[in-house]
């Protein structure tokens, strides 16, 4: 399969990393997925990627119960490394809260789920549907992700 120069410029390569011990994961809704790899294998390879997209879903209660697990420690390490390098962090729902926990939101505005607002201590939680502030792209929840997509696509080109 050959791509024209324009097509190559428009391609966005992606890899899905499971925040788990194995690549085989199941969503809280019961959907089974096989990721490309596990989050532990992304640690130390942050320079190979331009952005992280964190999809929240109902992950936060599970995260809270398992915050001390190696895969969640790796997740926080990856988010911190991407943020400190000024790389793009994209997420919705409570993703902004995790970015805040990772220590990469100082002085930045975030769109977060209303229930996550009180947990934001370094950044500034807003009531906006979505917010782009520097390298942080956040949406209040999944139904508002579309409101930031033009900016996401612009920066990823």
Model-inferred region functions:
Residues 1-12:
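Single conserved hydrophobic/aromatic residue that forms the stacking wall/gate
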Residues 52-56, 75-103, 110:
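Catalytic nucleophile loop
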């Amino acid at each position: 399969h050959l791509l024209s120069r324009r097509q190559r410029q428009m391609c966005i390569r992606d890899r899905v990393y499971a925040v788990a011990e194995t690549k085989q994961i199941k969503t809280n809704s019961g959907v089974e997925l096989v990721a490309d790899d596990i989050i532990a294998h992304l640690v130390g390879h942050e320079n190979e990627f331009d952005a992280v997209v964190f999809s929240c879903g109902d992950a936060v209660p599970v995260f809270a119960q398992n915050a001390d697990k190696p895969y969640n420690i790796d997740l926080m390490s990856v988010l911190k490394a991407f943020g400190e390098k000024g790389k793009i962090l994209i997420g919705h729902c409570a993703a902004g809260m995790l970015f805040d926990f990772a220590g990469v939101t100082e002085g930045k505005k975030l769109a977060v789920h209303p229930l996550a607002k009180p947990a934001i201590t370094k950044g500034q939680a807003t009531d906006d549907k979505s917010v782009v502030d520097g390298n942080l792209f956040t949406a209040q929840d999944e139904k508002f992700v579309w409101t930031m997509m033009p900016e996401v696509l612009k920066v990823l080109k």
